[in-house]
Protein backbone atom coordinates (compact mmCIF):
# COMPACT_ATOMS: atom_id res chain seq x y z
CA UNK A 1 0.00 0.00 0.00
CA UNK A 2 1.16 3.54 -0.61
CA UNK A 3 0.96 6.39 1.87
CA UNK A 4 -2.49 7.67 0.76
CA UNK A 5 -4.06 4.22 0.90
CA UNK A 6 -2.65 3.67 4.36
CA UNK A 7 -3.96 7.02 5.59
CA UNK A 8 -7.43 6.31 4.16
CA UNK A 9 -7.45 2.88 5.77
CA UNK A 10 -6.26 4.34 9.06
CA UNK A 11 -9.20 6.75 9.17
CA UNK A 12 -11.56 3.77 8.96
CA UNK A 13 -10.02 1.82 11.88
CA UNK A 14 -11.73 1.73 15.26
CA UNK A 15 -10.05 0.01 18.21
CA UNK A 16 -12.26 -0.66 21.20
CA UNK A 17 -12.66 -3.01 24.12
CA UNK A 18 -15.57 -4.02 26.28
CA UNK A 19 -15.34 -3.44 30.02
CA UNK A 20 -17.78 -4.68 32.62
CA UNK A 21 -18.16 -6.28 36.02
CA UNK A 22 -18.28 -10.11 36.07
CA UNK A 23 -21.54 -11.47 34.68
CA UNK A 24 -22.82 -8.25 33.20
CA UNK A 25 -22.88 -9.89 29.77
CA UNK A 26 -19.60 -8.89 28.22
CA UNK A 27 -18.72 -12.14 26.46
CA UNK A 28 -22.28 -12.51 25.11
CA UNK A 29 -22.13 -8.98 23.70
CA UNK A 30 -18.83 -9.84 22.01
CA UNK A 31 -20.52 -12.90 20.46
CA UNK A 32 -23.36 -10.75 19.08
CA UNK A 33 -20.93 -8.21 17.61
CA UNK A 34 -19.07 -11.03 15.86
CA UNK A 35 -22.38 -12.35 14.54
CA UNK A 36 -23.56 -8.95 13.34
CA UNK A 37 -20.34 -8.30 11.43
CA UNK A 38 -20.46 -11.82 9.90
CA UNK A 39 -17.04 -12.64 11.30
CA UNK A 40 -17.90 -16.33 11.30
CA UNK A 41 -20.16 -18.68 9.43
CA UNK A 42 -23.28 -19.50 11.45
CA UNK A 43 -22.11 -23.08 12.06
CA UNK A 44 -18.88 -21.90 13.69
CA UNK A 45 -20.63 -19.69 16.19
CA UNK A 46 -20.64 -20.94 19.77
CA UNK A 47 -21.38 -19.15 23.01
CA UNK A 48 -18.50 -17.24 24.65
CA UNK A 49 -16.55 -17.52 21.43
CA UNK A 50 -13.62 -15.40 22.54
CA UNK A 51 -13.18 -17.35 25.76
CA UNK A 52 -10.95 -19.91 24.11
CA UNK A 53 -9.51 -21.49 27.24
CA UNK A 54 -11.45 -24.54 28.38
CA UNK A 55 -11.30 -23.22 31.92
CA UNK A 56 -12.88 -19.90 30.94
CA UNK A 57 -15.84 -21.59 29.29
CA UNK A 58 -16.28 -23.88 32.26
CA UNK A 59 -16.20 -21.19 34.94
CA UNK A 60 -18.02 -18.73 32.69
CA UNK A 61 -15.44 -16.01 33.28
CA UNK A 62 -12.94 -14.35 30.98
CA UNK A 63 -9.36 -14.73 32.15
CA UNK A 64 -7.15 -13.89 29.18
CA UNK A 65 -7.69 -10.99 26.87
CA UNK A 66 -8.45 -11.76 23.21
CA UNK A 67 -8.29 -9.65 20.06
CA UNK A 68 -10.23 -9.92 16.80
CA UNK A 69 -10.53 -7.88 13.61
CA UNK A 70 -14.00 -7.30 12.13
CA UNK A 71 -15.30 -5.44 9.10
CA UNK A 72 -18.56 -3.52 9.40
CA UNK A 73 -20.51 -1.69 6.74
CA UNK A 74 -21.98 1.32 8.50
CA UNK A 75 -25.16 3.21 7.62
CA UNK A 76 -23.09 5.90 5.88
CA UNK A 77 -22.18 3.24 3.29
CA UNK A 78 -18.49 3.14 4.26
CA UNK A 79 -16.75 -0.03 5.39
CA UNK A 80 -14.97 0.19 8.74
CA UNK A 81 -12.33 -2.05 10.32
CA UNK A 82 -13.16 -2.74 13.95
CA UNK A 83 -10.68 -4.29 16.38
CA UNK A 84 -12.45 -5.74 19.38
CA UNK A 85 -10.21 -6.53 22.34
CA UNK A 86 -12.04 -8.62 24.91
CA UNK A 87 -11.11 -8.16 28.59
CA UNK A 88 -11.70 -10.00 31.88
CA UNK A 89 -13.71 -8.41 34.70
CA UNK A 90 -12.45 -10.06 37.87
CA UNK A 91 -10.40 -8.00 40.32
CA UNK A 92 -7.41 -10.38 40.08
CA UNK A 93 -7.20 -9.80 36.34
CA UNK A 94 -7.20 -6.02 36.31
CA UNK A 95 -3.75 -6.07 34.72
CA UNK A 96 -5.20 -7.98 31.75
CA UNK A 97 -7.71 -5.16 31.42
CA UNK A 98 -5.09 -2.41 31.61
CA UNK A 99 -3.11 -4.19 28.88
CA UNK A 100 -6.00 -4.34 26.48
CA UNK A 101 -7.09 -0.77 27.20
CA UNK A 102 -3.61 0.47 26.33
CA UNK A 103 -4.17 -0.88 22.81
CA UNK A 104 -7.52 0.93 22.28
CA UNK A 105 -9.04 4.34 21.62
CA UNK A 106 -12.49 3.57 22.95
CA UNK A 107 -14.31 1.34 25.42
CA UNK A 108 -17.84 0.03 25.64
CA UNK A 109 -18.93 0.12 29.26
CA UNK A 110 -21.49 -2.62 29.84
CA UNK A 111 -23.73 -2.16 32.88
CA UNK A 112 -26.38 -4.66 33.93
CA UNK A 113 -29.83 -3.02 33.77
CA UNK A 114 -30.92 -4.87 36.91
CA UNK A 115 -27.80 -4.74 39.07
CA UNK A 116 -26.43 -1.33 38.15
CA UNK A 117 -22.85 -0.27 38.78
CA UNK A 118 -20.58 -2.64 40.72
CA UNK A 119 -17.15 -2.15 42.29
CA UNK A 120 -15.20 -3.56 39.36
CA UNK A 121 -17.21 -1.59 36.84
CA UNK A 122 -15.82 1.49 38.56
CA UNK A 123 -12.28 0.14 38.78
CA UNK A 124 -12.27 -0.59 35.05
CA UNK A 125 -13.79 2.79 34.17
CA UNK A 126 -10.97 4.53 36.04
CA UNK A 127 -8.45 2.47 34.07
CA UNK A 128 -10.15 3.52 30.84
CA UNK A 129 -10.10 7.18 31.89
CA UNK A 130 -6.38 6.89 32.73
CA UNK A 131 -5.83 5.80 29.13
CA UNK A 132 -7.95 8.72 27.79
CA UNK A 133 -10.46 6.42 26.12
CA UNK A 134 -13.82 7.49 24.73
CA UNK A 135 -16.33 5.60 26.89
CA UNK A 136 -19.67 4.48 25.42
CA UNK A 137 -22.12 3.35 28.10
CA UNK A 138 -24.37 0.39 27.18
CA UNK A 139 -27.15 -0.74 29.49
CA UNK A 140 -27.44 -4.48 28.94
CA UNK A 141 -30.06 -7.12 29.85
CA UNK A 142 -33.01 -4.74 29.40
CA UNK A 143 -35.21 -7.79 28.69
CA UNK A 144 -34.91 -8.98 32.30
CA UNK A 145 -38.12 -8.60 34.34
CA UNK A 146 -36.17 -6.78 37.08
CA UNK A 147 -34.45 -4.37 34.66
CA UNK A 148 -34.69 -0.67 35.47
CA UNK A 149 -32.70 1.08 32.70
CA UNK A 150 -33.67 4.61 33.76
CA UNK A 151 -32.39 4.13 37.30
CA UNK A 152 -29.13 2.65 35.96
CA UNK A 153 -28.76 5.51 33.47
CA UNK A 154 -29.07 7.97 36.34
CA UNK A 155 -26.56 5.92 38.35
CA UNK A 156 -24.00 6.04 35.53
CA UNK A 157 -24.34 9.84 35.46
CA UNK A 158 -24.19 10.26 39.25
CA UNK A 159 -21.54 7.72 40.21
CA UNK A 160 -19.19 7.85 37.23
CA UNK A 161 -20.06 11.28 35.87
CA UNK A 162 -20.52 10.11 32.27
CA UNK A 163 -23.22 11.59 30.08
CA UNK A 164 -25.59 8.63 29.71
CA UNK A 165 -28.34 10.37 27.75
CA UNK A 166 -27.27 8.53 24.59
CA UNK A 167 -26.51 5.23 26.33
CA UNK A 168 -27.65 2.33 24.17
CA UNK A 169 -30.29 0.12 25.75
CA UNK A 170 -29.45 -3.41 24.68
CA UNK A 171 -29.90 -7.07 25.35
CA UNK A 172 -26.95 -9.08 24.10
CA UNK A 173 -28.83 -12.31 24.67
CA UNK A 174 -31.83 -11.28 22.57
CA UNK A 175 -29.69 -9.35 20.08
CA UNK A 176 -31.40 -6.00 20.79
CA UNK A 177 -29.46 -2.76 20.19
CA UNK A 178 -26.35 -4.36 18.70
CA UNK A 179 -26.48 -2.25 15.55
CA UNK A 180 -26.82 0.96 17.59
CA UNK A 181 -23.68 -0.01 19.49
CA UNK A 182 -21.73 -0.56 16.25
CA UNK A 183 -22.94 2.78 14.86
CA UNK A 184 -21.85 4.55 18.06
CA UNK A 185 -18.40 2.97 17.80
CA UNK A 186 -17.98 4.20 14.23
CA UNK A 187 -19.29 7.65 15.14
CA UNK A 188 -17.70 8.35 18.53
CA UNK A 189 -14.50 6.32 18.88
CA UNK A 190 -11.59 8.28 17.34
CA UNK A 191 -9.48 6.72 14.58
CA UNK A 192 -5.93 5.81 15.66
CA UNK A 193 -3.38 8.61 15.48
CA UNK A 194 0.11 7.77 14.33
CA UNK A 195 2.20 7.96 11.17
CA UNK A 196 2.91 4.98 8.93
CA UNK A 197 6.14 6.64 7.71
CA UNK A 198 7.64 7.11 11.18
CA UNK A 199 10.07 4.57 12.71
CA UNK A 200 8.22 1.44 13.80
CA UNK A 201 6.70 1.25 17.28
CA UNK A 202 4.53 -1.76 18.17
CA UNK A 203 3.32 -2.54 21.63
CA UNK A 204 3.23 -6.19 22.72
CA UNK A 205 0.06 -6.60 24.73
CA UNK A 206 0.05 -10.38 24.96
CA UNK A 207 1.90 -13.41 23.66
CA UNK A 208 1.60 -17.14 23.44
CA UNK A 209 3.94 -20.01 22.75
CA UNK A 210 3.50 -22.25 19.71
CA UNK A 211 5.76 -25.33 19.67
CA UNK A 212 6.30 -24.96 15.88
CA UNK A 213 6.45 -21.20 15.30
CA UNK A 214 8.01 -20.16 18.60
CA UNK A 215 6.69 -17.16 20.50
CA UNK A 216 3.80 -15.33 18.83
CA UNK A 217 3.43 -11.72 19.99
CA UNK A 218 0.05 -9.97 19.95
CA UNK A 219 0.81 -6.42 18.90
CA UNK A 220 -0.81 -3.06 18.35
CA UNK A 221 1.04 -0.91 15.78
CA UNK A 222 1.32 2.68 17.03
CA UNK A 223 3.69 4.13 14.41
CA UNK A 224 5.29 2.77 11.24
CA UNK A 225 4.66 -0.40 9.25
CA UNK A 226 5.94 -3.93 9.79
CA UNK A 227 6.30 -6.51 6.97
CA UNK A 228 7.41 -10.12 6.66
CA UNK A 229 11.21 -10.24 6.28
CA UNK A 230 11.85 -7.08 8.37
CA UNK A 231 14.61 -7.23 11.00
CA UNK A 232 13.04 -6.12 14.27
CA UNK A 233 14.42 -5.38 17.72
CA UNK A 234 12.80 -5.79 21.14
CA UNK A 235 13.53 -2.51 22.90
CA UNK A 236 13.62 -3.89 26.46
CA UNK A 237 15.85 -6.89 25.81
CA UNK A 238 17.74 -5.59 22.74
CA UNK A 239 17.31 -8.96 20.99
CA UNK A 240 16.87 -8.89 17.18
CA UNK A 241 14.76 -11.21 15.02
CA UNK A 242 13.56 -11.57 11.45
CA UNK A 243 9.78 -11.42 11.03
CA UNK A 244 8.45 -14.69 9.57
CA UNK A 245 4.75 -13.84 9.55
CA UNK A 246 2.34 -11.07 10.46
CA UNK A 247 -1.42 -11.21 10.43
CA UNK A 248 -4.70 -10.52 12.18
CA UNK A 249 -7.29 -12.52 14.06
CA UNK A 250 -10.62 -12.80 12.33
CA UNK A 251 -11.07 -14.97 15.19
CA UNK A 252 -8.93 -17.45 13.20
CA UNK A 253 -5.36 -16.34 12.49
CA UNK A 254 -5.19 -14.85 9.00
CA UNK A 255 -1.82 -13.95 7.48
CA UNK A 256 -1.25 -10.50 5.94
CA UNK A 257 1.62 -8.90 4.02
CA UNK A 258 2.01 -5.99 6.45
CA UNK A 259 0.57 -4.42 9.56
CA UNK A 260 0.41 -0.64 9.74
CA UNK A 261 -0.73 2.12 12.12
CA UNK A 262 -3.77 1.19 14.19
CA UNK A 263 -3.64 -2.51 13.33
CA UNK A 264 -4.06 -5.06 16.06
CA UNK A 265 -2.67 -8.45 15.12
CA UNK A 266 0.13 -10.92 15.66
CA UNK A 267 3.78 -11.18 14.73
CA UNK A 268 5.97 -14.30 14.66
CA UNK A 269 9.73 -14.19 14.21
CA UNK A 270 10.84 -17.70 15.21
CA UNK A 271 11.60 -16.47 18.72
CA UNK A 272 12.52 -19.63 20.59
CA UNK A 273 13.32 -18.24 24.00
CA UNK A 274 10.28 -17.38 26.07
CA UNK A 275 12.13 -14.62 27.99
CA UNK A 276 12.95 -12.55 24.87
CA UNK A 277 9.47 -11.08 24.49
CA UNK A 278 8.09 -9.33 27.52
CA UNK A 279 4.51 -8.17 27.51
CA UNK A 280 4.54 -4.35 27.48
CA UNK A 281 7.75 -4.18 25.45
CA UNK A 282 8.04 -2.14 22.24
CA UNK A 283 9.07 -3.71 18.92
CA UNK A 284 10.95 -1.49 16.47
CA UNK A 285 13.06 -1.91 13.31
CA UNK A 286 16.69 -2.92 13.84
CA UNK A 287 17.97 -0.57 11.08
CA UNK A 288 15.81 2.45 11.84
CA UNK A 289 14.86 2.16 15.50
CA UNK A 290 12.40 4.43 17.29
CA UNK A 291 13.98 7.00 19.59
CA UNK A 292 12.25 5.66 22.69
CA UNK A 293 9.94 2.80 23.66
CA UNK A 294 6.22 3.36 24.15
CA UNK A 295 5.00 4.02 27.64
CA UNK A 296 4.29 0.40 28.60
CA UNK A 297 2.04 -0.46 31.45
CA UNK A 298 3.53 -0.86 34.84
CA UNK A 299 4.97 -4.16 35.95
CA UNK A 300 2.58 -5.64 38.47
CA UNK A 301 3.89 -6.88 41.76
CA UNK A 302 2.46 -10.13 43.01
CA UNK A 303 0.57 -9.85 46.28
CA UNK A 304 0.11 -13.48 47.27
CA UNK A 305 2.77 -16.19 47.44
CA UNK A 306 2.57 -19.94 47.75
CA UNK A 307 4.72 -22.99 47.09
CA UNK A 308 3.90 -25.30 44.16
CA UNK A 309 5.41 -28.78 44.30
CA UNK A 310 4.96 -31.66 41.86
CA UNK A 311 3.49 -34.74 43.59
CA UNK A 312 5.89 -36.81 41.50
CA UNK A 313 9.27 -35.19 42.17
CA UNK A 314 10.65 -36.49 38.84
CA UNK A 315 8.45 -33.89 37.11
CA UNK A 316 10.23 -30.90 38.64
CA UNK A 317 11.67 -29.84 35.25
CA UNK A 318 8.29 -30.21 33.54
CA UNK A 319 6.84 -27.89 36.18
CA UNK A 320 9.54 -25.31 35.46
CA UNK A 321 8.75 -25.45 31.70
CA UNK A 322 5.04 -25.10 32.44
CA UNK A 323 5.62 -22.04 34.64
CA UNK A 324 7.89 -20.44 32.02
CA UNK A 325 5.23 -20.86 29.34
CA UNK A 326 2.50 -19.45 31.57
CA UNK A 327 4.72 -16.54 32.63
CA UNK A 328 5.14 -15.64 28.96
CA UNK A 329 1.61 -14.33 28.59
CA UNK A 330 0.91 -13.71 32.24
CA UNK A 331 3.28 -10.93 33.17
CA UNK A 332 2.09 -10.88 36.76
CA UNK A 333 3.24 -14.41 37.59
CA UNK A 334 6.62 -14.73 39.28
CA UNK A 335 8.41 -17.86 40.46
CA UNK A 336 11.72 -19.05 41.90
CA UNK A 337 12.93 -22.51 42.98
CA UNK A 338 12.64 -23.53 46.64
CA UNK A 339 12.97 -26.73 48.64
CA UNK A 340 10.99 -28.06 51.55
CA UNK A 341 11.90 -30.94 53.87
CA UNK A 342 8.36 -32.24 53.67
CA UNK A 343 7.70 -31.79 49.95
CA UNK A 344 11.07 -31.89 48.20
CA UNK A 345 11.85 -29.56 45.28
CA UNK A 346 9.34 -27.05 43.95
CA UNK A 347 8.75 -23.36 43.26
CA UNK A 348 7.73 -20.33 45.28
CA UNK A 349 5.22 -18.51 43.08
CA UNK A 350 3.77 -15.01 43.32
CA UNK A 351 0.21 -14.20 42.19
CA UNK A 352 -2.11 -11.20 42.09
CA UNK A 353 -4.74 -12.84 44.22
CA UNK A 354 -6.42 -16.08 45.15
CA UNK A 355 -8.41 -16.53 41.94
CA UNK A 356 -5.25 -15.93 39.92
CA UNK A 357 -3.51 -18.59 42.02
CA UNK A 358 -6.32 -21.11 41.53
CA UNK A 359 -6.44 -20.52 37.79
CA UNK A 360 -2.67 -20.95 37.34
CA UNK A 361 -2.79 -24.11 39.42
CA UNK A 362 -5.65 -25.50 37.38
CA UNK A 363 -3.99 -24.56 34.09
CA UNK A 364 -0.82 -26.41 35.08
CA UNK A 365 -2.82 -29.47 36.05
CA UNK A 366 -4.90 -29.38 32.86
CA UNK A 367 -2.70 -28.08 30.11
CA UNK A 368 0.54 -29.68 31.30
CA UNK A 369 -0.92 -32.69 33.16
CA UNK A 370 1.22 -32.17 36.29
CA UNK A 371 -0.31 -33.04 39.67
CA UNK A 372 0.52 -30.38 42.26
CA UNK A 373 0.68 -29.89 45.99
CA UNK A 374 0.22 -26.25 47.04
CA UNK A 375 1.17 -24.74 50.36
CA UNK A 376 -0.81 -22.10 52.24
CA UNK A 377 -0.69 -18.69 50.55
CA UNK A 378 1.13 -15.89 52.35
CA UNK A 379 1.87 -12.24 51.65
CA UNK A 380 5.15 -10.28 51.88
CA UNK A 381 6.03 -9.21 55.42
CA UNK A 382 8.71 -6.72 56.39
CA UNK A 383 10.66 -7.87 59.43
CA UNK A 384 12.78 -5.46 61.51
CA UNK A 385 15.32 -7.07 63.85
CA UNK A 386 16.57 -5.75 67.19
CA UNK A 387 20.08 -5.31 65.73
CA UNK A 388 18.77 -2.78 63.19
CA UNK A 389 18.65 -5.12 60.17
CA UNK A 390 15.49 -5.48 58.13
CA UNK A 391 14.43 -7.89 55.42
CA UNK A 392 11.45 -9.24 53.51
CA UNK A 393 9.73 -12.56 54.26
CA UNK A 394 7.40 -14.15 51.72
CA UNK A 395 7.66 -17.67 53.11
CA UNK A 396 6.63 -18.33 56.73
CA UNK A 397 9.47 -20.83 57.21
CA UNK A 398 12.00 -17.99 56.69
CA UNK A 399 10.66 -16.06 59.68
CA UNK A 400 13.55 -15.48 62.15
CA UNK A 401 13.54 -16.44 65.82
CA UNK A 402 10.90 -14.39 67.73
CA UNK A 403 13.51 -13.23 70.30
CA UNK A 404 15.45 -11.35 67.61
CA UNK A 405 12.46 -9.51 66.11
CA UNK A 406 11.81 -5.87 66.95
CA UNK A 407 8.62 -5.49 64.88
CA UNK A 408 6.85 -6.99 61.87
CA UNK A 409 4.96 -4.93 59.29
CA UNK A 410 2.35 -6.32 56.94
CA UNK A 411 0.72 -4.92 53.78
CA UNK A 412 -2.66 -3.23 54.14
CA UNK A 413 -5.23 -2.65 51.40
CA UNK A 414 -7.97 -0.13 51.01
CA UNK A 415 -11.08 -2.13 50.16
CA UNK A 416 -14.13 -0.51 48.57
CA UNK A 417 -17.16 -2.74 49.05
CA UNK A 418 -20.43 -1.98 47.27
CA UNK A 419 -23.36 -3.59 48.97
CA UNK A 420 -27.17 -3.28 49.20
CA UNK A 421 -28.45 -1.51 52.36
CA UNK A 422 -29.79 -4.66 53.98
CA UNK A 423 -26.38 -6.27 54.19
CA UNK A 424 -24.33 -3.37 55.59
CA UNK A 425 -24.30 -4.93 59.07
CA UNK A 426 -23.15 -8.30 57.78
CA UNK A 427 -20.32 -6.75 55.78
CA UNK A 428 -19.16 -4.59 58.70
CA UNK A 429 -19.07 -7.68 60.88
CA UNK A 430 -16.89 -9.56 58.37
CA UNK A 431 -14.51 -6.61 58.03
CA UNK A 432 -14.13 -6.23 61.78
CA UNK A 433 -13.52 -9.96 62.13
CA UNK A 434 -10.75 -9.52 59.57
CA UNK A 435 -9.05 -6.76 61.64
CA UNK A 436 -10.42 -4.08 59.31
CA UNK A 437 -10.52 -0.36 60.20
CA UNK A 438 -13.64 1.53 59.12
CA UNK A 439 -12.81 4.57 56.97
CA UNK A 440 -15.90 5.78 55.16
CA UNK A 441 -19.46 5.01 54.09
CA UNK A 442 -21.23 6.61 51.14
CA UNK A 443 -24.72 6.10 49.72
CA UNK A 444 -24.80 5.61 45.94
CA UNK A 445 -28.60 5.80 45.85
CA UNK A 446 -31.46 4.82 48.18
CA UNK A 447 -30.58 1.14 48.05
CA UNK A 448 -26.81 0.83 47.78
CA UNK A 449 -23.82 1.80 49.90
CA UNK A 450 -20.07 1.87 49.38
CA UNK A 451 -18.10 0.95 52.49
CA UNK A 452 -14.40 1.74 52.65
CA UNK A 453 -12.18 -0.26 54.99
CA UNK A 454 -8.48 -0.69 55.56
CA UNK A 455 -7.78 -4.40 55.94
CA UNK A 456 -4.55 -6.43 56.17
CA UNK A 457 -3.94 -8.17 52.84
CA UNK A 458 -3.26 -11.46 54.62
CA UNK A 459 -6.85 -11.48 55.89
CA UNK A 460 -8.23 -10.97 52.38
CA UNK A 461 -6.05 -13.75 51.02
CA UNK A 462 -7.78 -16.48 52.98
CA UNK A 463 -11.51 -16.54 52.41
CA UNK A 464 -12.64 -12.92 52.55
CA UNK A 465 -14.21 -13.01 49.09
CA UNK A 466 -16.13 -16.23 49.80
CA UNK A 467 -17.43 -14.91 53.12
CA UNK A 468 -18.44 -11.62 51.54
CA UNK A 469 -20.38 -13.36 48.78
CA UNK A 470 -22.09 -15.90 51.02
CA UNK A 471 -23.15 -13.38 53.69
CA UNK A 472 -24.62 -10.95 51.16
CA UNK A 473 -26.25 -13.61 48.94
CA UNK A 474 -23.75 -12.71 46.23
CA UNK A 475 -24.76 -9.02 46.04
CA UNK A 476 -21.61 -7.44 47.42
CA UNK A 477 -18.83 -6.57 45.00
CA UNK A 478 -15.41 -5.48 46.05
CA UNK A 479 -12.23 -3.95 44.75
CA UNK A 480 -8.99 -3.27 46.58
CA UNK A 481 -5.74 -1.40 46.19
CA UNK A 482 -2.53 -1.64 48.19
CA UNK A 483 -1.88 1.34 50.48
CA UNK A 484 1.39 0.31 52.16
CA UNK A 485 2.76 -1.37 55.25
CA UNK A 486 1.78 -1.01 58.92
CA UNK A 487 3.18 -2.69 62.06
CA UNK A 488 1.12 -5.61 63.43
CA UNK A 489 1.49 -8.14 66.25
CA UNK A 490 2.31 -11.14 64.11
CA UNK A 491 3.71 -14.50 65.13
CA UNK A 492 4.75 -17.59 63.22
CA UNK A 493 2.88 -20.77 64.04
CA UNK A 494 4.54 -24.12 63.39
CA UNK A 495 2.81 -27.48 63.19
CA UNK A 496 4.62 -30.52 64.62
CA UNK A 497 3.65 -34.06 63.66
CA UNK A 498 5.17 -36.81 65.76
CA UNK A 499 7.46 -34.10 67.25
CA UNK A 500 8.84 -33.13 63.84
CA UNK A 501 8.13 -29.75 62.33
CA UNK A 502 6.40 -29.83 58.92
CA UNK A 503 7.81 -26.70 57.27
CA UNK A 504 5.11 -26.57 54.59
CA UNK A 505 2.35 -26.21 57.20
CA UNK A 506 3.84 -23.16 58.98
CA UNK A 507 1.91 -19.90 58.68
CA UNK A 508 2.02 -16.37 60.05
CA UNK A 509 -0.91 -15.28 62.18
CA UNK A 510 -1.99 -12.34 64.35
CA UNK A 511 -1.20 -12.93 68.01
CA UNK A 512 -4.81 -12.34 69.13
CA UNK A 513 -6.24 -15.06 66.93
CA UNK A 514 -3.29 -17.47 67.23
CA UNK A 515 -4.87 -19.67 69.90
CA UNK A 516 -8.13 -20.18 67.99
CA UNK A 517 -6.38 -20.74 64.68
CA UNK A 518 -4.06 -23.32 66.27
CA UNK A 519 -6.95 -25.18 67.82
CA UNK A 520 -8.95 -25.32 64.59
CA UNK A 521 -5.99 -26.50 62.52
CA UNK A 522 -4.97 -29.21 64.96
CA UNK A 523 -8.54 -30.55 65.00
CA UNK A 524 -8.69 -30.46 61.20
CA UNK A 525 -5.39 -32.26 60.77
CA UNK A 526 -6.55 -34.90 63.24
CA UNK A 527 -9.46 -35.69 60.93
CA UNK A 528 -7.41 -35.55 57.73
CA UNK A 529 -4.19 -37.42 58.53
CA UNK A 530 -4.77 -41.18 58.26
CA UNK A 531 -4.18 -43.26 61.40
CA UNK A 532 -0.76 -44.86 61.62
CA UNK A 533 0.43 -48.05 63.33
CA UNK A 534 1.66 -45.83 66.19
CA UNK A 535 0.09 -42.84 67.90
CA UNK A 536 0.90 -39.45 66.40
CA UNK A 537 0.82 -36.25 68.46
CA UNK A 538 -0.12 -33.07 66.53
CA UNK A 539 1.03 -29.80 68.09
CA UNK A 540 0.63 -26.17 67.11
CA UNK A 541 3.51 -24.11 68.54
CA UNK A 542 4.64 -20.50 68.65
CA UNK A 543 8.38 -20.44 69.30
CA UNK A 544 8.83 -23.04 72.06
CA UNK A 545 5.31 -22.72 73.43
CA UNK A 546 2.70 -25.35 72.52
CA UNK A 547 -0.61 -23.60 71.86
CA UNK A 548 -2.74 -26.61 71.04
CA UNK A 549 -2.30 -30.38 70.94
CA UNK A 550 -4.19 -33.47 69.90
CA UNK A 551 -3.28 -37.11 69.33
CA UNK A 552 -4.16 -39.46 66.49
CA UNK A 553 -4.72 -42.84 68.15
CA UNK A 554 -2.78 -45.81 66.79
CA UNK A 555 -4.38 -48.61 64.85
CA UNK A 556 -3.84 -51.89 66.66
CA UNK A 557 -4.41 -55.51 65.99
CA UNK A 558 -6.39 -57.45 68.53
CA UNK A 559 -3.56 -59.63 69.90
CA UNK A 560 -5.89 -61.26 72.42
CA UNK A 561 -8.06 -62.90 69.76
CA UNK A 562 -6.33 -66.27 70.26
CA UNK A 563 -6.65 -66.32 74.07
CA UNK A 564 -9.85 -68.01 75.16
CA UNK A 565 -10.43 -67.14 78.79
CA UNK A 566 -7.07 -67.91 80.29
CA UNK A 567 -4.69 -66.17 82.62
CA UNK A 568 -4.49 -62.36 82.85
CA UNK A 569 -0.68 -62.47 82.97
CA UNK A 570 -0.67 -64.24 79.58
CA UNK A 571 -2.79 -61.38 78.12
CA UNK A 572 -0.61 -58.75 79.79
CA UNK A 573 2.46 -60.29 78.20
CA UNK A 574 0.93 -60.09 74.70
CA UNK A 575 -0.29 -56.50 75.23
CA UNK A 576 3.08 -55.35 76.59
CA UNK A 577 4.84 -56.95 73.66
CA UNK A 578 2.54 -55.06 71.27
CA UNK A 579 3.14 -51.79 73.14
CA UNK A 580 6.91 -52.30 72.91
CA UNK A 581 6.64 -52.85 69.14
CA UNK A 582 4.54 -49.68 68.70
CA UNK A 583 7.10 -47.68 70.66
CA UNK A 584 9.93 -48.89 68.41
CA UNK A 585 7.85 -48.09 65.35
CA UNK A 586 7.13 -44.59 66.62
CA UNK A 587 10.80 -43.77 66.97
CA UNK A 588 11.51 -44.58 63.31
CA UNK A 589 8.10 -44.06 61.65
CA UNK A 590 7.39 -41.05 59.47
CA UNK A 591 3.93 -39.62 58.80
CA UNK A 592 2.61 -39.08 55.28
CA UNK A 593 0.74 -35.77 55.02
CA UNK A 594 -2.08 -35.83 52.42
CA UNK A 595 -2.72 -32.83 50.11
CA UNK A 596 -6.03 -32.09 51.91
CA UNK A 597 -4.06 -31.30 55.05
CA UNK A 598 -2.16 -28.50 53.28
CA UNK A 599 -5.42 -27.13 51.93
CA UNK A 600 -6.94 -27.23 55.43
CA UNK A 601 -4.53 -24.54 56.51
CA UNK A 602 -6.07 -22.35 53.79
CA UNK A 603 -9.74 -22.97 54.28
CA UNK A 604 -10.27 -21.75 57.81
CA UNK A 605 -14.06 -21.80 57.59
CA UNK A 606 -14.62 -23.30 61.04
CA UNK A 607 -13.67 -20.25 63.03
Curated annotation (Swiss-Prot):
This is Elongation factor 4. GO terms for cellular component: plasma membrane. It catalyses: GTP + H2O = GDP + phosphate + H(+). Keywords: Cell membrane, GTP-binding, Hydrolase, Membrane, Nucleotide-binding, Protein biosynthesis. It is found in: Cell membrane. The lineage of its organism: Bacteria, Bacillati, Bacillota, Bacilli, Bacillales. It comes from the Bacteria. Residues 11-193 form the tr-type G domain. GTP binds at residues 23-28, 140-143. Its main location: membrane. Pfam families: EFG_C (PF00679), GTP_EFTU (PF00009), GTP_EFTU_D2 (PF03144), LepA_C (PF06421). It is a peripheral membrane protein. GO terms for molecular function: GTP binding; GTPase activity; ribosome binding; translation elongation factor activity. Required for accurate and efficient protein synthesis under certain stress conditions. May act as a fidelity factor of the translation reaction, by catalyzing a one-codon backward translocation of tRNAs on improperly translocated ribosomes. Back-translocation proceeds from a post-translocation (POST) complex to a pre-translocation (PRE) complex, thus giving elongation factor G a second chance to translocate the tRNAs correctly. Binds to ribosomes in a GTP-dependent manner. GO terms for biological process: positive regulation of translation. Belongs to the TRAFAC class translation factor GTPase superfamily. Classic translation factor GTPase family. LepA subfamily. Its EC number is 3.6.5.n1. It is an enzyme of class 3 (hydrolase). SUPFAM superfamilies: EF-G C-terminal domain-like (SSF54980), P-loop containing nucleoside triphosphate hydrolases (SSF52540).
Amino acid sequence: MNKEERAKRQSKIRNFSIIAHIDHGKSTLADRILEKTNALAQREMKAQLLDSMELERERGITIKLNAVQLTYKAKDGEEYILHLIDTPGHVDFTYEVSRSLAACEGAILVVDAAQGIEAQTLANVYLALDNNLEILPVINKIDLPSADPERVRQEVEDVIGLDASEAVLASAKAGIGIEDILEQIVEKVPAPTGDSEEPLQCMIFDSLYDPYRGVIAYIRVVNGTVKVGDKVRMMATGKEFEVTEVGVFTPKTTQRDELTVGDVGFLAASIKNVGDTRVGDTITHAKRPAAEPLKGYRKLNPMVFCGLYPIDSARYNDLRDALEKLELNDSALEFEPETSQALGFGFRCGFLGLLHMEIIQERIEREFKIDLITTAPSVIYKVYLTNGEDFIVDNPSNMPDPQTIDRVEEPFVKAAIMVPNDYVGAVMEICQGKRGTFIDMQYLDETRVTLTYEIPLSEIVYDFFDQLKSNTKGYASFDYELIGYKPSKLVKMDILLNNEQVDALSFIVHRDSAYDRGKVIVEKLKKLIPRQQFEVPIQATIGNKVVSRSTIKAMRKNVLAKCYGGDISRKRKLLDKQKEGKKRMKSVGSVEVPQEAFMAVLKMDDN
